[in-house]
Amino acid sequence: MENLEFIEEVLEQEHKYSEILPVSDESVYETYEFCDEQCLEDCTISAVQEFYEADLHRIPPYEEASVEQRAQYLTEFHDNFSMQTGYANNLHFVNDMNPRDYGAFNPYTKRIDINANLLKDDDTQEIMNTIMHESRHAYQHFAVEHPELVSVDMETIRIWEDNFNHYIRPEFDYEEYQNQPVEADANDFAERMYNEGLCNVA
């Protein structure tokens, strides 16, 4: 699928969902400063660690919190590393998403939409991994659009750009969808950041 078609498909869904929290008055912020990949990893690992350490003292803790409180906790988690992806203030929890869809990054609006149903699960791993996965897609797109502002090598950026231009949708071939470069990279990023952050929890 060509990138334009992919963007059009995303835009068709843009107004379909209702927010679980009021939309921030602030628009998505895009940085034009250098976004180092190692710094992104370090900040994300620290964000995972700090999320779990904070929950030891938080009132109420995540398991006892309302859906709205959980969304706020996870927004703060995302805020701790999102600027390193190239964007900030772009996380939204939305209702009415297809139950099979956990989240999505919109390359046109730069929004990250997360399925609000994930907030009902007391276990945070799935929703945190989804936030990190979609944040990695944000970084991939930022790298393609601003190669001079990232530490990613040009060959990798070329591969990502080509993949976005010929993106494989999961409904067409799920195995190929999972194995394509941008999805394999986002899955690896989310898994590594979560595991390393969890290992650092005091």
Where are the predicted features?
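Auxiliary, metal-adjacent structural segments of Zn-dependent hydrolase domains
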Residues: E2, I7-K110
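Metalloprotease/metallohydrolase-associated module, dominated by Zn2+-dependent proteases
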Residues: Y87-N89, E148-A202
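A conserved beta-strand element that flanks and buttresses the S-adenosyl-L-methionine
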Residues: I131
